[in-house]
């Protein structure tokens, strides 16, 4: 719903509108297992826009536009965050499988701790070394493995492809007495049933209710000023400056700070335009006058890339000259 108005004997136009959209199964893409997968959410988008132009004297013109947009995911929206598969739950840890596997998995912290304890006990004194995840979530060098040991790199495959407890290499058994090596379990290990893992070990759903849609800054502003005047009987010139500003937004639907946050930025442009009655036009311009570098969007890649992120930025400062002829 909107309104369009002409004011001040035609010297000013003032337009405005309000809007409300309700989406079902709004699609947002992310990379999973090297494939683009659509996540579907219900969402609402509402806001208001205003634009105005004013020419107080012949040749001098001002323009302004502003927008407010409120975007929200519906209650009950949820998804697995690939860079935070445990959703901050300390009882679970992210494990990277073999390099040939495309996706990480999650395993209970108790399973990881018991595997590390069993490996150390079974391989005490062995000279062969490798590296595995430590209980603190990083890498620990110097863990000693025998040739038939089960490294943590296999734990995801064992749990979610074979359906066995990685500690025992057998189907779930409550309070198992021994580990894979036949050594007694002394740490009070209760056993792990892979069937009970959240979402088959892919991760824990995050509650996204009320989160903003990606690349939807709540506030945007633009303004410009130009002055046109005759230079001779054949030529006219126009000088113009315009700017654009947008507030903070998010690159992903998870709205994780600071990773997902896209900071607001300002962009200013200048131009000089010369035209004549024969259809020639010459324009000299500067885009992004202050050489502002801002990230305007980001795209998260899959686990096997190390969860690398592609970012999109504003163009650098650009000087240009354009000559055109119209017939």
Predicted features and spans:
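Gram-negative outer-membrane beta-barrel transporters
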Residues: 20, 39-253
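Flexible, surface-exposed loop regions and adjacent strand-edge segments
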Residues: 30-37, 78-89, 93-94, 255-260, ...
């Amino acid at each position: 719903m909107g309104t369009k108005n002409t004011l001040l004997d035609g010297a000013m136009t003032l337009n405005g509108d309000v809007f409300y959209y309700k989406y079902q199964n709004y699609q947002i893409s992310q990379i999973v297992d090297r494939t683009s997968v659509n996540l579907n959410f219900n969402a609402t988008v509402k806001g208001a826009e205003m634009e105005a132009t004013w020419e107080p004297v012949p040749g001098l013109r001002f323009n302004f536009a502003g927008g407010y947009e409120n975007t929200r995911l519906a209650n009950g929206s949820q998804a697995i965050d690939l860079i935070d598969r445990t959703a901050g739950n300390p009882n679970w840890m992210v494990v990277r499988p073999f390099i040939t596997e495309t996706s990480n998995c999650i395993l209970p912290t108790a399973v990881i701790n018991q595997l590390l304890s069993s490996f150390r006990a079974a391989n005490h004194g062995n000279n062969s070394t490798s590296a595995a995840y430590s209980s603190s979530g990083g890498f620990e060098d110097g863990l000693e493995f025998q040739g038939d040991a089960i490294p943590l790199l296999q734990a995801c495959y064992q749990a979610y492809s074979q359906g066995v407890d990685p500690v025992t290499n057998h189907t779930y058994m409550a309070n198992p007495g021994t580990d894979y090596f036949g050594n007694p379990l002394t740490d009070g290990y209760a056993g792990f049933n892979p069937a009970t893992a959240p979402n088959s070990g892919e991760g824990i759903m995050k509650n996204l209710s009320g989160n903003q849609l990606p690349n939807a800054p709540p506030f945007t502003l633009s303004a410009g000023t130009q002055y046109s005047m005759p230079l001779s009987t054949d030529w006219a010139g126009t000088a113009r400056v315009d700017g654009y500003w947008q507030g903070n937004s998010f690159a992903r639907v998870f709205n994780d700070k600071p990773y997902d946050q896209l900071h607001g930025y300002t962009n200013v442009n200048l131009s000089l335009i010369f035209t004549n009655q024969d259809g020639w036009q010459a324009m000299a311009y500067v885009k992004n006058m202050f050489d502002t570098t801002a990230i305007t969007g980001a795209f998260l890649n899959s686990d096997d890339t190390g969860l690398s992120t592609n970012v999109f930025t504003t163009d650098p400062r650009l000087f240009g000259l354009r000559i055109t002829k119209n017939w």
